[in-house]
Amino acid sequence: MITMIRRFIQLDAAAGVMLMMATVLALTFANWSVTAAGYQQFLMMPVEMRFGALEINKNLLLWINDGLMAIFFLLIGLEVKRELVEGSLASRQQAMLPLAAAVGGMVFPALFFLLFNANDEVTRVGWAIPAATDIAFAIGVLTLLGKRVPAGLKVFLLALAIIDDLGAILIIALFYTQQIFWPALGGAVLAVAALAYLNRQQVRKTSAYLLVGIVLWVCILKCGVHATLAGVIVGFFIPLRTSNGEPSPAVTLEHGLQTWVAFLIIPLFAFANAGIVLQGIVLEKLFSPLSLGIAAGLLVGKPLGITLLSWLTIRLGYARLPAGVGFSQIVAVSVLCGIGFTMSIFITLLAFSGGDAELITYAKLGILLASGLAALLGYLALRGVLPVLDKAVQPCKG
């Protein structure tokens, strides 16, 4: 288990670097006169796929956001299932602290956003934008502190982020679903039933689940619910345990996907969506209720919610601090959780899917600026509270 956590952290740290590079490239390409037009043409390039009579025609940007991101959510589904069955969320005692922290880290940012936007019926639909945490960026910053970071603090952050991702998935399903096309929803229900049947029959071939998953993705895409949810559903049904000692299909697929997601899908998503055209940006609008609400949610709501609910859960005796971790370290890492970036941008695109380009631009700017500041403040806070290297808690051998 410790070995798996180390591998995950190392991969996410490298992914964080890739994300930063992709973001810088996107901003450069979108604003440099030599590449700006080509960048937009690349994203708007039409891509058509046919499956018999079925035709799906979208531009490249939407294929990245609806198609490739479904693979990212498949990985999340696999990770959540593993943690729930045999990982850091497998028991009530283990799960309570990160669960409480994650709930606080979603509710409080939304409340802070609404403080600025509750009276604006156009912008208040973005209340969930600051509720997300970008685990790759957060882990990337955490690893800059090396062996000073206790293993228990890393596990806490990973568990919190996994629950946070699950919360974001539920928010997308419940609050950002457009008009339902019922025949397609019926097809999605049948596809889920087929996945359940495969699981119950203990089918071990991952390809069988993925084929049904493609059908599910198409049905969900057509019915009006966001298609990326298909990935999570498929991940939950792929078997984790085997009775005859064979390799776990879920763990095998998870390991196979991690590199592709970390080094291709998420950086490509960042490259496609972080290219904000800075020309024409009005400073007054940068301090609009939308941008300020996002910044307040990420920079104040996140750490406040995580800290308060963590303290309350420990105080009431429902959980205890991880071994070798002080409460000041929980407070410091809560600041780091204000890095919203990819998931916050993803929810922005859903919240303002009507196509208001100006709202999306200023929301993205708020996310980028707040996430960058959260990364800096979180790093400085952790550097101040973590033990010096010679006194650091040594990681467990695994």
Swiss-Prot record:
<keyword id="KW-0997">Cell inner membrane</keyword>
<dbReference type="InterPro" id="IPR004670">
    <property type="entry name" value="NhaA"/>
</dbReference>
<keyword id="KW-0915">Sodium</keyword>
<feature type="transmembrane region" description="Helical">
    <location>
        <begin position="96"/>
        <end position="116"/>
    </location>
</feature>
<dbReference type="Pfam" id="PF06965">
    <property type="entry name" value="Na_H_antiport_1"/>
</dbReference>
<keyword id="KW-1003">Cell membrane</keyword>
<dbReference type="InterPro" id="IPR023171">
    <property type="entry name" value="Na/H_antiporter_dom_sf"/>
</dbReference>
<feature type="transmembrane region" description="Helical">
    <location>
        <begin position="60"/>
        <end position="80"/>
    </location>
</feature>
<feature type="transmembrane region" description="Helical">
    <location>
        <begin position="263"/>
        <end position="283"/>
    </location>
</feature>
<feature type="transmembrane region" description="Helical">
    <location>
        <begin position="214"/>
        <end position="234"/>
    </location>
</feature>
<dbReference type="GO" id="GO:0006885">
    <property type="term" value="P:regulation of pH"/>
</dbReference>
<feature type="transmembrane region" description="Helical">
    <location>
        <begin position="179"/>
        <end position="199"/>
    </location>
</feature>
<feature type="transmembrane region" description="Helical">
    <location>
        <begin position="125"/>
        <end position="145"/>
    </location>
</feature>
<feature type="transmembrane region" description="Helical">
    <location>
        <begin position="14"/>
        <end position="34"/>
    </location>
</feature>
<keyword id="KW-1133">Transmembrane helix</keyword>
<comment type="function">
    <text>Na(+)/H(+) antiporter that extrudes sodium in exchange for external protons.</text>
</comment>
<keyword id="KW-0813">Transport</keyword>
<keyword id="KW-0472">Membrane</keyword>
<keyword id="KW-0050">Antiport</keyword>
<feature type="transmembrane region" description="Helical">
    <location>
        <begin position="155"/>
        <end position="175"/>
    </location>
</feature>
<feature type="transmembrane region" description="Helical">
    <location>
        <begin position="292"/>
        <end position="312"/>
    </location>
</feature>
<dbReference type="GO" id="GO:0015385">
    <property type="term" value="F:sodium:proton antiporter activity"/>
</dbReference>
<feature type="transmembrane region" description="Helical">
    <location>
        <begin position="362"/>
        <end position="382"/>
    </location>
</feature>
<keyword id="KW-0406">Ion transport</keyword>
<protein>
    <recommendedName>
        <fullName>Na(+)/H(+) antiporter NhaA</fullName>
    </recommendedName>
</protein>
<feature type="transmembrane region" description="Helical">
    <location>
        <begin position="330"/>
        <end position="350"/>
    </location>
</feature>
<dbReference type="GO" id="GO:0005886">
    <property type="term" value="C:plasma membrane"/>
</dbReference>
<keyword id="KW-0739">Sodium transport</keyword>
<comment type="similarity">
    <text>Belongs to the NhaA Na(+)/H(+) (TC 2.A.33) antiporter family.</text>
</comment>
<keyword id="KW-0812">Transmembrane</keyword>
